[in-house]
From Swiss-Prot:
Pathway recorded for this protein: Isoprenoid biosynthesis; dimethylallyl diphosphate biosynthesis; dimethylallyl diphosphate from (2E)-4-hydroxy-3-methylbutenyl diphosphate: step 1/1; Isoprenoid biosynthesis; isopentenyl diphosphate biosynthesis via DXP pathway; isopentenyl diphosphate from 1-deoxy-D-xylulose 5-phosphate: step 6/6
Organism (species): Pseudomonas syringae pv. tomato (strain ATCC BAA-871 / DC3000)
Name assigned to this protein: 4-hydroxy-3-methylbut-2-enyl diphosphate reductase
Alphabetized UniProt keyword annotations: 4Fe-4S, Iron, Iron-sulfur, Isoprene biosynthesis, Metal-binding, Oxidoreductase
Pfam families recorded: LYTB (PF02401)
Amino acid sequence: MQIKLANPRGFCAGVDRAIEIVNRALEVFGPPIYVRHEVVHNKFVVEDLRSRGAIFVEELEQVPDDVIVIFSAHGVSQAVRTEAAGRGLKVFDATCPLVTKVHIEVARYSRDGRECILIGHAGHPEVEGTMGQYDAVNGGAIYLVEDEADVASLEVRNPESLAFVTQTTLSMDDTSRVIDALRKRFPAIGGPRKDDICYATQNRQDAVKQLADECDVVLVVGSPNSSNSNRLRELAERMATPAYLIDGAEDMQKGWFDGVERIGITAGASAPEVLVRGVIQQLQAWGATGADELAGREENITFSMPKELRVKSLL
């Protein structure tokens, strides 16, 4: 059995920044540091931060007064920001800047009284945060659609004053079809020049397609609640390549690789490389050889830290 590695894979700039914000807050201010929602959707990362004093909560009502709170990479609604400000909580915002870009678009449509359609998965924290950027005070509304069937049944108030945005971690292929359906149903709809799916999601989806084309089975390292990791598994399966989403080496079953010659490994944007290395080691213990990385797109994007953490970390 031969191992092939997707390139790029694993952490993106937004995840790197979010984790580093929690790390630096712990270093500068000491525990406990409260984090609203899992800072990124990865069990290993969350448990590591929890062991060092991060406390993860789902709502601000679980947070005591006079503590530091960090908003997760997925972003939060305006109502959550207002609640935090009203309580005087000290907040560091780990929202991915590419998610913030979508928030700004939604807020602008709201101010203009333009209705908005969000393409995304119901219940995902990024979707909840983005929906919560829209203020209906000007008479508009925001709608959520997941697929073409949702578009077909959608009724809006004013189809002549309508725009769309997308969740950043969707399947590019699926999203393209939904956008086509929106443009066909609502010819006057506006939106970004391209969808809002982020560079890291696009690059990892392109890489897993190459991996699935060259391999007999694909392993996606990522947690079950990670949207972008699930999309990678689905893409491989659509190419008729068996694919498994695993948190780490302990989730693998040796029988998956009976008769397999080439094993492909990738990782979602919130999965650390140490987990990939663990998977490789286990496969090699089962007789796999090599760990060749495919040619891919280089990523050199970085996002800046909040100023207070950036300055204090140098003292």
